[in-house]
Amino acid sequence: MNTILAQQIANEGGVEAWMIAQQHKSLLRFLTCGSVDDGKSTLIGRLLHDTLQIYEDQLSSLHNDSKRHGTQGEKLDLALLVDGLQAEREQGITIDVAYRYFSTEKRKFIIADTPGHEQYTRNMATGASTCDLAILLIDARKGVLDQTRRHSFISTLLGIKHLVVAINKMDLVDYREETFARIREDYLTFAEQLPGDLDIRFVPLSALEGDNVAAQSANMRWYSGPTLLEVLETVDIQRAVDRQPMRFPVQYVNRPNLDFRGYAGTLASGSVKVGERIKVLPSGVESSVARIVTFDGDKEEACAGEAITLVLNDDIDISRGDLLLAANETLAPARHAAIDVVWMAEQPLAPGQSYDVKLAGKKTRARIEAIRYQIDINNLTQRDVESLPLNGIGLVEMTFDEPLALDIYQQNPVTGGLIFIDRLSNVTVGAGMVRELDERGATPSVEYSAFELELNALVRRHFPHWDARDLLGDKHGAA
């Protein structure tokens, strides 16, 4: 058993008491990102090693793997703790997003180790989508690079407010303060173009040698700030979803018998109480909460992030993809939106194309109307383009086949974030964050029967070359 884990269990008075204590610790999700070979995997390995989170058999295996695949000579190659794919070990790089878990006396952590190569930017965006903090590694010898800027921008685009700029490999520049100061100034100059509400911190360190990772460095006495671990343990994470109105996307209709009908999902934001009046979108029908069912039994109130099943007092038509919110809240469904897109496919994104889109539990089709601009990650300027290439980031105008209940992504990532799915291969080809909503066309001016709407959708889906217009919106072909 891990020695520090055994000591923690003993200090708490047994396994059960230790598990209860773990449940009450706050959780921080963070990712490491930056350019290739900046030392992201090594840093995570060092964090795990210096916090004594590695079991004896893992340490023994690491010694053997370091001899076969290591890139650090006689030293332990801590990056091998994270780089698990055979291709990663052979090339000495990270390709996939690797997740690791550890805890200290103050906090629990989930780490996402993301790749640095530009062609794997899509993997980095995937890792960043669930994180609260980003560690941006910079090689002290190279300074701020294009990929550093790209990852910084993607992190802020995905709503991350806390950035820790870890200037790594200080041992290779003789721990010089002027090198740290120069890179810090360069990054702050670039960061002037990022959102103004960011919490940016700088830590000089050496992941290989352990300087300023979990313990203060004797080689950089000119630095009086906290170590990286101290920053992670003390950073104050304020979750925006706790302060946002109630949003409950229905993932599953739970009907185990004739006497029970519940609507299961994860509460995306806000809170809900028994007896509270709620409204169902897109239908607009209202009811009230009769029960809040959880794995541990019924509750009187649930908060954001909890997996629950809601039982209502009325039998109303609710299905997967519907959204429940407080009855006094106003959220008008929209068919048109401007979306920040991170494109992840070899085939460029271009106007006129149609994709399936998935938002929470809702799946529908969307058409690309226009690309307003692509963002140049070197200087964050906007440029006109006809298409968005692989790993490109831009603002795109879209029209959905049906009105959707959407929020702005920065206000609610669950109901404001979506993915693009190729209709033929069923592969995820892009990620989108709602920037602007346009409610025009959300309600049709002409009433059509259910049969007419179903027939129209059938024709547009299976016979796109007929160029049939969408009865619920603008005239266009459903390509």
Swiss-Prot record:
CDD domains per UniProt: CysN_ATPS, CysN_NodQ_II, CysN_NoDQ_III
GO molecular function term, any single one: GTP binding
Region (G3): 113-116
Keywords noted in UniProt: ATP-binding, GTP-binding, Nucleotide-binding, Nucleotidyltransferase, Transferase
Residue segments, region G2: 92-96
Pathway: Sulfur metabolism; hydrogen sulfide biosynthesis; sulfite from sulfate: step 1/3
Gene Ontology biological process terms in this record: hydrogen sulfide biosynthetic process; sulfate assimilation
Annotated region (G1), positions in chain: 34-41
Reaction(s) catalysed by this chain's protein: sulfate + ATP + H(+) = adenosine 5'-phosphosulfate + diphosphate
Gene3D superfamilies: P-loop containing nucleotide triphosphate hydrolases, Translation factors
Alphabetized PROSITE patterns for the sequence: G_TR_1 (PS00301), G_TR_2 (PS51722)
Region of interest (G5), ranges: 206-208
EC category name: transferase
Pfam families, A to Z: GTP-eEF1A_C, GTP_EFTU
Region G4, residue ranges: 168-171
Amino-acid positions noted as binding GTP in the UniProt annotation, renumbered to this chain: 34-41, 113-117, 168-171
EC number in record: 2.7.7.4
Subunit structure: Heterodimer composed of CysD, the smaller subunit, and CysN.
Record-stated family: Belongs to the TRAFAC class translation factor GTPase superfamily. Classic translation factor GTPase family. CysN/NodQ subfamily.
NCBIfam families associated with the record: CysN, PRK05124.1, small_GTP
Name this polypeptide is given: Sulfate adenylyltransferase subunit 1
Organism of provenance: Salmonella paratyphi B (strain ATCC BAA-1250 / SPB7)
